[in-house]
Regions:
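Hydrophobic anchor residue at the start of the ABC signature
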Residues: 146
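Catalytic Walker B motif of ABC-type/P-loop ATPase nucleotide-binding domains
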Residues: 157-161
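Conserved ABC transporter NBD signature motif
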Residues: 65-79
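Helix-to-loop junction immediately C-terminal to a conserved catalytic motif
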Residues: 57
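The feature captures the beta-strand-to-loop junction immediately N-terminal to the Walker
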Residues: 42-44
């Protein structure tokens, strides 16, 4: 896993806040995303993870705050040239087969054709290429969405719940695929609620609770912070660290 160097931050999120009526979904959220890393956004259901992804991607307008790319503020429209967002639970072009969806996406986004066959093999999509998207199981659809993301040309890939719908073996294979396709000029930002999966694939973590960032850092940094806050030693398991900090 890569080491974190603050000087290598490719994206900086500064003071993002978002409310829906009287409900504060995000409250002064700030963190950095570094080039060539897998950053995990970790939080319980309802913590604001999806809202944060949508605001960072420019799909939702934040009430205040800014997103910087290489120290330059970037508005919502221009973010699409830098960020590619893969939402959870969507069914793109449901009547079309997997092969059509991937080929169309490659052409529309000017995607990474050089890794097309490798991504298909890594995500075991070959048997599904002629199957309509609507006929896929939840796990099969998730693997197709992961392929769409990996083939996108943007340097920063945001994936909401990359392991949702996958069994244990598939989750491990998906994590290995993400790690395999991580390059020095590419960054993956993953929203995950499965703590065990996050600990295995991510280099650093942003912990979100109640719409606020409660901690950010590598696992050893978060473990030390959790022990300091708890006032006593804690097991090394990420689950215990997460519970202590949130």
């Amino acid at each position: 896993m890569v080491a974190h160097d603050p000087s290598q931050a490719v994206v900086r999120v500064d003071g993002l806040s978002k409310s829906y009526g009287r409900v504060r979904a995000l409250d002064d959220v700030a963190f950095s995303i570094c080039t060539g890393e897998i950053l995990g956004l970790i939080g319980p259901n309802g913590a604001g993870k999806t809202t944060l992804f949508e605001c960072v991607a420019g799909l939702e307008a934040a009430d205040r705050g800014a997103v910087f790319f290489e120290s330059v503020p970037v508005d919502g429209q221009r973010r699409s040239t830098k960020l590619f967002y893969v939402p959870d639970g969507i069914t793109p072009w449901p009547e079309q087969p997997v092969s059509w969806v991937l080929d169309y996406s490659l052409g529309f986004f000017a995607g990474r054709r050089g890794i097309y066959q490798q991504v298909i093999a890594d995500l075991a999509l070959s048997p599904l290429m002629r199957v309509p998207i609507r006929a896929l199981s939840k796990g099969q659809r998730k693997r197709t969405l992961l392929a769409l993301g990996l083939l996108a040309p943007q340097p920063i890939l945001l994936i909401d719940e990359p392991f949702e719908g996958l069994d244990l073996r598939q989750s491990r294979e998906a994590a290995a695929t993400l790690r395999k396709h991580l390059t020095p000029d590419r960054t993956f930002f993953l929203s995950i609620h499965q703590i065990a999966d996050a600990a295995k694939v991510c280099d650093r973590f942003v912990l979100l609770s109640g719409g606020r960032v409660v901690a950010e850092g590598k696992l050893d940094t978060l473990t030390a912070l959790a022990r300091q806050r708890a006032g006593h030693s804690l097991p090394a398991a990420f689950e215990e660290v997460f519970l202590a900090l949130t």
